Curated annotation (Swiss-Prot):
One GO cellular component, as annotated: cytosolic large ribosomal subunit
InterPro entries: Ribosomal_bL12, Ribosomal_bL12_C, Ribosomal_bL12_C/ClpS-like, Ribosomal_bL12_oligo, Ribosomal_bL12_oligo_N_sf
Keyword Ribonucleoprotein: yes
Gene that this sequence comes from: rplL
Family per similarity comment: Belongs to the bacterial ribosomal protein bL12 family.
Molecular-function GO terms, alphabetical: mRNA binding; structural constituent of ribosome
Name of the protein this chain belongs to: Large ribosomal subunit protein bL12
Annotated CDD domains: Ribosomal_L7_L12
Protein source organism: Shewanella halifaxensis (strain HAW-EB4)
């Protein structure tokens, strides 16, 4: 003889809250599942698929040719000699922030050609 859904519902209605909790725990254990509601995150995939449009160029090291890197920094940023020297010696430091991908790639190439170690974030 099989039990119908209605009979199960009637049996549940007759149980106390503690008995229902114990039943749920037993069902979780027997079937290897959780009664916790599944969390649905909306928009997470859309945000991940969205391409980054602003980049920061970070000088991680001035390398062996500090003078050439200082000259490249002065040309790229318009800083004075003292400010560019301080920037080169303060690595890691952001050279430019929130710039386009093309501008970031060009700046990175210029600084690397001068001997600096650069990363784009």
């Amino acid at each position: 003889m099989s039990i119908t859904k209605d009979q199960i519902l009637e049996a549940l209605a007759a149980m106390s809250v503690m008995e229902v909790v114990e039943l749920i725990e037993a069902m979780e254990e027997k079937f290897g599942v959780s009664a916790a509601a599944a969390v649905v995150s909306g928009g997470g995939e859309a945000a991940a698929a969205e391409e980054k449009t602003e980049f920061d160029v970070i000088l991680t090291s001035h390398g062996a040719n500090k003078v050439a890197v200082i000259k490249a920094l002065r040309g790229a940023t318009g800083l004075g000699l003292k400010e560019a020297k301080t920037m080169a010696e303060s690595s890691p430091i952001a050279v430019k922030e929130a710039i386009s991908k093309e501008e970031a790639d060009a700046l990175k190439a210029d600084l690397e050609a001068a001997g600096a170690e650069v990363e784009i974030k």
